[in-house]
Amino acid sequence: VGSEMCIRDSKVEDLTKAQLVSIYTGETKNWSEVGGDDQAIVVIGREAGSGTRGAFEELLDIADACVYANELDSTGAVMAKVASTPGAIGYVSLDVVDDSVKALKLDGVDATEENIKAGNYALSRPFVMATKGEISEQKTEVQALFDYLSSDEGKALIKSVGLITVD
């Protein structure tokens, strides 16, 4: 699953990983420092304990170092806050990005399915399903779920909600 960096309105199209770290740790405070307008950066993120936040901070190696203006309890809330707040930046799952915000490139790379699968986009992580023991040792219903999600129909469903399948 990819995490997309989104902003409200700025000349900035692309950030480096180092710039993103600097923004989220509070070192960079104004968009003019990264090629944008002279406007304060408003850092939006998920609440402590969120899996999305944990993955984002882990991927950037900044766990417990972020300085947030707002910590919100859902991806939808992050999107809405970024869309309504001048100078805002936030991270959301790739499957929820819409036209209310502007998506940013990271190190010149768009968060596309192709780039994520190729390992070229830095803010991505796999979601995995796990069982205690082999799938063949599980209840029939569990085996059926794994079989379905691995089928063409299951993969189509996963893609239909904006997620990326493992081929």
Model regions and ranges:
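Exported/periplasmic ABC-transporter solute-binding proteins
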Residues: 3, 8-167
